Each structure stands twice: as C-alpha cells, then as structure tokens.
Amino acid sequence: MNKAKFLEVISGGLIVSCQALPGEPFYTEEGGLMPYFALAAKNAGAVGIRANSVRDIKEIKEKVSLPIIGIIKRDYPPEEPFITATMREVDELVAIGVEVIALDCTLRKRHDGLSINTFIEKVKKKYPQQLLMADISTFEEGKNAYQAGVDFVGTTLSGYTKESKKQNGPDMKLIKQLVQENICVIAEGKIHTPEQARQIKKLGVAGIVVGGAITRPQEIAKRFVDALNKEEKDV
C-alpha cells in the first residue's frame, strides 16, 4: 500500500491500538486475544489497527483485513528507546508485510549507536517502499524525523519521555505545531474520550490512534475508580 492509498483509507477515521504487554491481564504467552480486540474495532468501524509483535500482528491479519501500523517493543537497557529500536525489529516487521512500521524517533541515545537520522536513512535505503511512522515526544523530534524522510509523525511518546511535559490528556499543542508545519501527523497518546478525538480531527491530522481508552480495560476501570475515590475525598 502506498502513502496516498493509506492516507485515503485512514482519512477521518479511527485507528485502534490493540496491545497487551507482559504483566497485563490480557497478555498471554500463547497469544490469541489481540485479534478479538482488532475484530471488535473493525466491527465498530475502525479504519486501521496498531499492533505490537510478530505473533500478534500475524494473528490479527488472520481476523481482519485493515491496514496495520506495526511495532515491536523490545528493551535494550540501559538505552531508553524500545519501540522498533533497531534494524532487527524492522526486518521482522517487513517480513510479515505490515503497511506502516512505527519506530522510536526521539533524539535519545540508541542501542545501535546510530543517530536517528542515520537509522532512518538506513531503513529507507534497505526498504525504499516501506511506509514509516515516527513515534516522537517533542516538536523538535517530529520535525527532525519528517525532514529525515519518515512518512508520518505520531505524537505517541509525548508525556512519556524526560524531554516532554507530563499531562493527563492528548498533547494538543504539539499536534497543532506539527500540523502547522505541514507535517503529516497521526495523533496518538492519551486520547481518552470521543470528544478529544473530535477536537483533534478538526486540527487537520492525517489520522488518529486510540489505544488504552478502548483496549485496556484495567486502565479504563482505574480511571473510574480514581474519579470515584477523588470525589469521596473532595466531599
């Protein structure tokens, strides 16, 4: 799928992130659960899926035919980047045919010792037809990655790095800044409500990814519990 077709497919719609990590209730060593989240998303009208790991992506592709933004989360301590952080992960994702590969494009020190610009250059040289999405946390990171040649910039990591401001909702300021620079933005990160998604859509983004607010029941339940506990304390 080329960039124009992907943009056409996701335009105005919802991409649902279907992920579960070790230690979370919906993670199992055997797999098998994420495809049903993806199927539910498809049945609700979602236009795309974001998913983690070769296993989950393969299983999801058997259930739905929606385009997939694929990632592989793999830790490389002491370095912080862990989302498709090396060529090893890129190779694995290309091999299973995901439409878009998302990768950490922050300016933090990397396990492979490369600058993010050099890494992007190497990926594009090896896989010139592969669509790439930059997961970033700041305007500087987003602009840098886009100029380096990625197809889309995602606000995925805003609030999750030392370089970005912690907040409870989506980083509207960052989204606006990137859009105003004519960067192709896929908004993602802490989008908790349909109204927030509607507001983001009006900013002119290329796409919107929602994850925890849909596919992580433990997080959803905790927001309700925290709100109720706060109300009791306020009385």
From Swiss-Prot:
Annotated GO CC locations: cytosol
**GO BP term (any one):** carbohydrate metabolic process
Q: Which gene encodes it?
A: nanE
EC number(s) per UniProt? Answer: 5.1.3.9
Q: What is this protein called?
A: Putative N-acetylmannosamine-6-phosphate 2-epimerase
UniProt-recorded Gene Ontology molecular function terms:
N-acylglucosamine-6-phosphate 2-epimerase activity
Lineage of producing organism: Bacteria, Bacillati, Bacillota, Bacilli, Lactobacillales
The family classification in the record reads: Belongs to the NanE family.
Q: What does this protein do?
A: Converts N-acetylmannosamine-6-phosphate (ManNAc-6-P) to N-acetylglucosamine-6-phosphate (GlcNAc-6-P).
One Pfam family of this chain: NanE
Q: Which domain of life is it from?
A: Bacteria
State the CDD domains in the record: NanE
Name the chemical reaction catalysed here: an N-acyl-D-glucosamine 6-phosphate = an N-acyl-D-mannosamine 6-phosphate
Q: Which keywords fit this entry according to its UniProt record?
A: Carbohydrate metabolism, Isomerase
